[in-house]
Design a protein with these regions (language model features):
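N-terminal hydrophobic targeting signals that begin at the initiator methionine
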Residues: 1-2, 19
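Sec-dependent signal peptide recognition
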Residues: 2-8
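C-terminal motif of bacterial Sec signal peptides marking the signal peptidase cleavage site
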Residues: 14-17
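N- and C-terminal low-complexity/disordered segments
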Residues: 19-112
Length: 112
C-alpha cells in the first residue's frame, strides 16, 4: 500500500511540473523554438508573441511584457531572421524603413 501511495505521489508531481507551451497551430518550427527559449528567459510576467503580415511576409513580434517602460520588441520573419526591434528607449517604430503601424495584426500565437 505504501508503494502504491508513493508511486501515485510521484506521478502527480511529475505531471504537475510538466507544462506544455500552448503555441498556435501553424506557427513555424523555428519560431516555436524561439518561443520556448523566450518563455524560459522572460523576466516579465506577461510576455507574448504576435503574428503580423508586414512587407509581404508573416513576421513575429516577441514582446517582453509590461514590467518595463523602455523594453524593445524583437521582430523575426518566419525563418527566424531578425527584421528589427520596435520601441525601446529610442522608441523605434520602423522596420526596414517602413512604419510598423502599416502591419496587419493576424493573431497572438503565444501568451504566458
Amino acid at each position: 500500500m505504501k508503494n502504491l501511495i508513493a508511486i501515485l505521489l510521484l506521478a502527480v508531481t511529475l505531471f504537475s511540473t510538466c507544462k506544455k507551451l500552448e503555441i498556435e497551430e501553424g506557427t513555424p518550427n523555428c519560431i516555436r523554438s524561439k518561443i520556448s527559449a523566450f518563455e524560459k528567459d522572460a523576466f516579465c510576467s506577461d510576455p507574448q508573441v504576435d503574428e503580423y503580415q508586414f512587407q509581404s511576409e508573416y513576421v513575429y513580434v516577441f514582446i517582453d511584457g509590461s514590467c518595463g517602460a523602455d523594453l524593445a520588441a524583437t521582430v523575426f520573419d518566419s525563418k527566424c531572421n531578425i527584421k528589427g526591434r520596435l520601441g525601446g528607449i529610442e522608441g523605434n517604430t520602423k522596420i526596414n524603413g517602413e512604419e510598423f503601424n502599416s502591419a496587419k495584426f493576424i493573431k497572438t500565437v503565444w501568451k504566458k
